[in-house]
Amino acid sequence: WLILDTPQDTEQLIECFVPKGEKAKQIFLPDGSEVWVNAESILIYPNTFKGDTRTLFLNGEANFKVSRDKKKPFIVKTATLDIEALGTTFNVESYSNSPQTIATLEEGKIKVSTKDSIPHETILSPNEQFIYDRDTHSREINIVDAQRLSNWKEGQLYFKNAPFGKLVKTIERKYNVTILYDQEKYKNN
C-alpha cells in the first residue's frame, strides 16, 4: 500500500499495487464497494469520495462489486475506456502492455465509453463482454460466462477460445515467469 501526498485542498489518493506473481488482493473502498486487484495491476482511488462521482484509475485487472449510490456514479477510468456503474458487479482488464481493454459484466448494468476522437457508448447486460482494441479502434461484444472469467480472484484460471498469446501473458503475470516461445508461429492461435 502506498499513500500518495497531494495538496491539502485535494483528496488524498491511495494506490493499491499487486506485483507480478502475487495473489490477488481484496480491498474495500470508502463507500463499502469491494474490489479484487489482480497481479501486475495498479488501482488508484481517493481516501474519500467527494464530489459528484466515485472515480478510480486502473492499469491492470480488477473485479468490482459496487455499492449502490444513484447520486454518485461509480467510474473506473483506464487508458482507453471509462466504465460507469450505479450498483453492480463487473470485471475490467486493461494492462498497458496489451492493446485490448475488456469490460465484463456479471450483475446489473454498466455503461462503457471509449476515449476515441469519436467517443462511443455501450450499455452492457449480465454476461456480456465489451472488447476494445486501441490499435485498431475496433469494438466487439461477446456473450461469456462472466462468473467463470472472474475466478482469478480465487486463484483459478479459465480460458475459452483465448489466443495463445493471452494465455501466455496471463500465466507469466500470475506466476512471475517468462515463457519463451515462437511468437510468430503462434501469432494467430
Tell what function each PLM region has:
Residues 1-189:
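A residue-level detector for the "anchor" residue at the start of short, highly conserved motifs
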